[in-house]
Design a protein with these regions (language model features):
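Short glycine-rich phosphate-binding loop at a beta-alpha junction
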Residues: 46-56, 240-252, 273-275
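N-terminal beta-alpha supersecondary unit
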Residues: 1-58, 87, 91
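Conserved phosphate-binding catalytic cores of ATP/NTP-utilizing and phosphoryl-transfer enzymes
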Residues: 85-109, 290
Length: 313
């Protein structure tokens, strides 16, 4: 990998979440400077590119349209292949980036993909053959973190703040209701509601309950979410017999989840693959590696290829 440039969108923090209109405008403003910087860091010219890979979905349509339009224009101007990439496939395949692991991951592997928009358990048989074993039926785990953080008065995105405060808290301080789905699917809406009601009850007796016990509240809530994730991934591993287990997506940066997986790996014959932090949140490298494997297959999408807010896995 020659370069992996990212333009942050801190503009959303003031609104407590991503604002689609602001996101697409930021994409328009940043896309040219980011590409120029990427080429400069890589020390190559546009004419040396072999193909253009881009995200065509799923995601916010306005932002996707900016990237799709630019990618099509660039591929046409340079007369090189145009390769559309599924956003979630890219998260899963980020583990194939050359510098992702000291020992390369091998197929098959299970991938727990956890972010603000998705929670999925995926059986990865090859770069182009993947099967969803389970996914959330309502809210993603990243959203569960962010909504709880908002209730606690923490900045957006809330997940990293809960993670940081959890390190200083007691994970047994509070208990929250968790769903008990019989399969590999997830549900976090009930836990979010349980979290809200538990705090409301405590604050009736002690209005300063959150301030007095913030670290313990965060630690308890994070532990409850991780318990659900670990229960499902362990069940899927046992059922499939797959020995390689990976995580992906923004929540894969969570220190508690990473520690729980590493502890499981140390106590079993399971090989755990944790992505480097630069490959956890959305990044260009993961789109590049997913596009690379399609390039090897000779993929060259027509210029009529469109962005899609929702797209089949």
């Amino acid at each position: 990998m020659l370069s992996n440039e990212v333009a942050s969108q801190a503009v959303h923090e003031a609104f407590g979440g991503v604002v689609p209109e602001l996101a697409s405008r930021a994409h328009q403003q940043n896309i040219m400077p980011v590409i120029d910087r990427a080429l400069k860091v890589a020390n190559i010219s546009p004419q040396e590119l072999n193909a253009i890979a881009f995200t065509n979905g799923p995601g916010l349509l306005g932002s996707l349209l900016v990237g799709t339009s630019f990618a099509k224009s660039m591929a046409l101007a340079l007369d090189i292949p145009l390769i559309p990439v599924h956003h979630m496939h890219a998260h899963v395949l980020a583990h194939l980036i050359e510098d992702a692991h000291p020992k390369p991951i091998s197929f098959p592997y299970l991938c727990l993909t956890v972010s603000g928009g998705h929670t999925q358990l995926i059986e990865v048989l090859s770069s182009k053959e993947m099967k969803i074993l389970g996914e959330t039926i309502d809210d993603a785990v990243g959203e569960a973190f962010d909504k709880a953080a908002k209730i606690l008065g923490l900045p957006y995105p809330g997940g990293p703040h809960i993670d940081r405060l959890s390190a200083k808290g007691d994970p047994t301080f509070m208990e929250f209701n968790e769903s008990n789905l019989p399969d590999y699917n997830f549900s976090f809406s009930g836990m979010k509601t349980s979290f809200l009601y538990a705090l409301q009850k405590e604050m009736k007796a002690n209005p300063s309950f959150i301030n007095d016990h913030l670290n313990d509240i965060c630690a308890s809530y994070q532990a409850a979410l991780i318990k659900v994730l670990m229960k499902k991934v362990k069940a899927a591993q046992k059922s499939t017999g797959i020995k390689n287990v990976a995580i992906a997506g923004g929540v894969s940066a969570n220190s508690g989840l990473r520690a729980a997986l590493m502890q499981w790996g140390a106590q079993s014959e399971i090989s755990i693959y944790l992505p480097p932090f630069q490959y956890t949140t959305d990044n260009a490298a993961m789109i590049g590696i997913a596009g690379y494997y399609q390039y090897l297959e000779g993929v060259n999408a027509p210029l009529s290829t469109s962005a899609q807010a929702k797209i089949k896995f």
